[in-house]
Structures are given as structure tokens and as C-alpha cells.
Amino acid sequence: MKTKNHFPGIRQDWFSPLYIGLIKGLKVFFFYLAVLCLFRALYIGILHAFWADGTRLTDAIYAFFRGGKLSMQTAGVLTLPTFLPGFFTGFVSSRMARCVTLILAGVFLTVLSVLFAASFTYYRTFHANFNQMIFVGVQDDRAALFWTMVQQFQLPLRLLGALVLGAVLLFLFKKVYDAKCPIVRIFGENFWHELLWKLPAAPRLGIHLSARVLFLFFVCLIAKLSIFGGGLGWQTAVDWENAGVTRDPFLNEAILDSPQALYRAYRLNGRMRACNGLDFTVEDIRNLAANLSGKAPTSDNLDDYLTRTAAGAKIAKPRHVVLIISESLANWPLLDKYGNIPISSGLRSIIAADDADYCPTFLPNGASTVSAVTGIVTGFADANLYLTTMPESFAAPFPTASAPTMERLGYRSRFFYAGPATWERIGEFTRAQGFSEFVSRGDFGDVPGSVWGAEDEVLYEKFFEHIDPNTPSFDVLLNASNHSPYDIDLDAKGFDKEAVRAALPEKYRKDEELLRELGHYWYADKCLAAFVREVKEKMPDSLIIIVGDHADRYHIEKQPNTYERYGIPFIITGKGVHKGTLTANSAGSQIDIIPTVLDLIAPKGFSYEALGKSLAAGNDRGVNYGFWITRDAIGKSDTDPLVPEGLDGSEGAPIDDGAMQNYINAIRSISWWRPKYGATLDEQILKEKGR
């Protein structure tokens, strides 16, 4: 690359072309960032009519700056294909390098302008930034879609305006790209150059090298910020899944620039397309459903096999049903063998109380939080369907959905989430599945927390702000603190790390990371216990359920046995509950929670649909995506025959292999067919829709 000598009297070296090239790369990056931020500001301002009631200017400013952090990632992605071809071409010809860069910049700026122009109409139509509806539109009648855009949305005029905008931006880009950066003059011209040469050789060389190091450090810093969406690591990164933290749905969408919104649509559509079918025939499903329900396999309506009739309430109907899904709440700290480690005293005290019962043989619905949410919200097991992205989930609540069933019993349903409403589309998903109200971090204001959500104590505090003790309610709370990056100030919360360290086996006492993880379990446990006490004090007529979303995140042992690795607790407490409320041989998974609640409180004759069964009525097995469990054993669900493993890791006692296989297949096949194909069991549907 031929460059002007900006250091007269100093021999040009390898750094000069690198420096000039990187300066141009920074210009490209900051120009893209400025364009994206300008577009966001205009988007927020022009569409201000879509601001939610109560949204303030400060909320919009916060969304603008949070979006700016996210757009650093977008700008970085756009900079690479714009800048790198020209940079390497520059070693052959500076003129050619400039030409290549301007052409590529023109293409990208035009695309950004077209997307910007389209985003207004898109939001007015779908009340969202670009989303999965784009892929639905691709499958639609394209001719009709085209003429609709021409006639209703003035496509030619908008496209012309976008092209003009792209041309203006390219003109400005050329001016910025060709302009001399003031930093160049610092290194070779006028006052600074003359001042530098007046210094002795050694200081001059030191300043020269220091300037290079600082410049390269700045470039690396910008690169890191662009990789992590305005953060210095993934712990503080803003991405499309955690971006929406305001209380305003419109502002949450505005945080995403157009490329990020398109990426979101692509990822969500990919998840939905990954929902492959399971290998069951219609006849298989009919027979399995009949066997599960104890009915004859004579109906082609799958819902007939899911319909239950309550035998009658076992406890007085509570005014409130509160279900806490606690992040990474594993069961192993509650086992007797770990009783000396002081991280679970709160849950242990709840379990020990007379008004509580506890099932220690319980499985999560899947390996992640979203599986727990879908299992509890819809009543279906994890069956290789990404329910939070499937259109069927947003058409109407499934008949097994928890919120509509509880509302039929007179409860108002709410879902409280410590994180953003945009995570896994949880806000839209829970409302689509019948929850009357959704409350998330965006409703909390400026509160302490991590990238995943507000601190647990904040979530519980906000719960009481939304509750009327006199109005019956069904409330689900999903917390987030017991999650990496494990960055809560545990000392400020009162965690006695040294007491925990002393209780650990000698070989683990120096493991600071493990101590930090255990400290977050302690924090979750402490907040849970305090919350349960407060619920019982303020709303004594309440039924409270505590369950982990999943386990398998950390353990004292590096290779724990299967039960300790995957088991989660199921705790039920409140008025009317006593030891023995759950049967002695009870076992289950998250799809069994709502059936258990209904078995306890629903009046005789109450009709509902459910896949799971009640732990208060003898359910003695649970199954999820990869495992099964009973009161005495656990095992993988994909082996034939099934291989039992004792809860202590030893060889398990034999089980009825056929019965367990049928149960596993029934749960999976129904959880696959009903959400994806509906209630009708018809081979033709499978042929038309495919697996």
C-alpha cells in the first residue's frame, strides 16, 4: 500500500500502512454506527404514537443508548465485509482499494436504507420489528403480496426514497472516508511533528512507540465492544434476546436495529424449522394415549384421552396459588449427605414445617429454562418442538395450558419474570397461552441484577406490588439470580463464604469458582424462604409450589451420579398441606405440577385436560427429554431395555420395562402431535404437513 510519508525524516516501516488502514476501518465502523443510531432515533420519534401509556422520554433515551450498544455489534459485522476487501486490495493499489470500499459501502448503505424505510410500515402492520412473519410471507402468494405493497404501502415511492437516502449516505460516507483524520496530523504534521522532533531521541522513540501501543489498544477495545454488543464480555453483552428490558413493547422493538431484527427472525425461524417430527404413527399415538388414560382406543380425537374429571378437592380451595420456578435450583443440596453445607437452610426449614410436603424424585422438563416454562405453561413435555416459536402456540391456548384452566376455577393468572419480556418471546408466549398479565424486568425500573434479570429479592418485592390479597390469583414467578455469570455481591447479602469453605471436602476448599456458585444457591435459597414467609404472612390462604427449572449446572463433585446431576426439588406448602399430601412413592416431572394442583383444589366434577398426573394421587414416575425417574431409580430413556440406576449411583432394582417404555412413548408422542397437528388423529394430516 503506497502511503504519503506522514513522518518526514523518519523511515516508513510496517506500521504506517497498517495505521492508515486501521484509521479507515475505524471510519467505516463509526459511520455505520452513526447511521444505525440515527435510524433508531428517527424510528423512535416518528413512531412515538406507539409508545405505551406512561412511557417517558427517559425511557426512550434509555432504549436509544441500549440499542446503540447492540448496534456496535451490527456496525462491526458490516465493517468487516466493507473494509477488509479494500484493505487487502490496498497493498496492490490504493485507488482500487478506495473504489472497492466505496462500492461495498454503497451496497450496504442502500440495504440499510431500504430496511429503514420498510421498518415503519412493518411495525404499523405487525406491531413488531422484523420477525418470523417475513418467512411466513415468503411462503405466501407472492404476486398478491407484491401488489398489496404497491397499492397499500406505496412501494415504488418508498423504494425511491430509500434509494435516494442510500445515495445521500454514500455521499457522506465518501466525504468521511476521504477526510484527513486529525490523528494523522498528530503523527506527522505541523505543531505536533515539530514538537516531537525537538525532543531527544530516547523520549521521542518512547512517545512514538507508546502512541502506537495506545492506538492498537483502542482498536482492540472497539473490536471487543463490537463482538460483545457494547460489553467487554458476554456477561455484560447486549444481544437480540436480552435487549428488551423496558416496560414499553415498542421501545423493546426499537432497541433492535434492522439487521439485528432480521437476525432474530432468522434464528427463531431456524428453531422452529428444527422441530423435527418423532417416529410415531397415528395408530401408535392412539394406542399410547388410550393406554395412558385407561380408555379404549376408539376415538380419533386426542383430546378425548386427555380429558379428566376431578374427584373432588382434597384441601380447602386456597385464595392464591403461587408457583415459583427457581433458576438452577437443584435437589442435591437438600440431600442428607450435604446437610452440613450451609447453603440450603431456607428450603430445609420450609420442607420440615408441618404445612409442607416434598418430593425429592422430580425431573425438569428439559435441560434449559425455556423447557421448564413450556412444560408448566402448556402442560406438554419436551418433544423436540420449540413451542415459543411455533405459530400454533400463538393461535390459541392449548387445552392443557395451565392459565386458562386455573382461570376457570376463578383465579386471575399472572406470569412474573425477572428478565426481559423478549427472552425466548416469553412475554408474547405466556399471554398467547392464556395468562392475563405478564410482568417482567421492563416493569421494574432501574433495579439491581445481571444480564439475565433482576435480583431475586427485587422480583419478589415487585410481586407484592402487583397483588391484591383479596382477589384470587394464580401466579407463576420465574427468577434468574442463580445463573452465570454469578456476579451478585454475596458479601453485601451476608454470605458466609468461610463457613461454606470449611464444610467442603478438603480438595475443593480452594475452588473459588465453586464457592461463588454455591453462594448463589445460598442467595436463591435465602430469598425463597423469605418470600414464602412473607406470602404466608400477607396471604395466609395460599398454596405455594417451589420447583427448580433445571439442575446440571454445578455440583461439589466433578462427576455426580445421574440423580444428583439432574434431579430438582418439588415442594408444596401452605394452608391445608401436610406430610402425606403427596403419596409416599411419588415421583414426577414439571408436566405433573398443574395436575397435582388441580387434584388438590378442583371441585368434584370439574372437567379439564392434562397430560401429566397428580403426585397426590399416586403418580410414581416422571419422564423428560432424556431420562425417567421413580422413587427408587433413574435412567436414560433412550436405551432398550431401560437400565435402572439407583439414586445413590449403584445398580438399580429391576422395573417394569414395558410399562415405563409405554409411558415414555405416550408422553412424547402426545406432546409432539397435539401442539403441532391438533386434536384430530389422521394420517392424512401427517402426509400434508410432514414431520
What is the predicted role of each segment?
Residues 55, 136, 140, 257, ...:
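Short coil/turn linker and secondary-structure boundary residues
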Residues 248, 255-309, 317, 353:
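The feature marks either
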Residues 52-59, 128-132, 144, 148-155, ...:
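General structural signal for secondary-structure boundaries
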Residues 2-274:
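Transmembrane and membrane-interface helices of multi-pass
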Residues 293-691:
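Solvent-exposed soluble domains appended to multi-pass membrane proteins
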Residues 17, 21, 144, 258-261, ...:
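Exposed alpha-helical structural elements
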Residues 35, 142-143, 256-259, 282-285, ...:
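Alpha-helix initiation and N-capping motif
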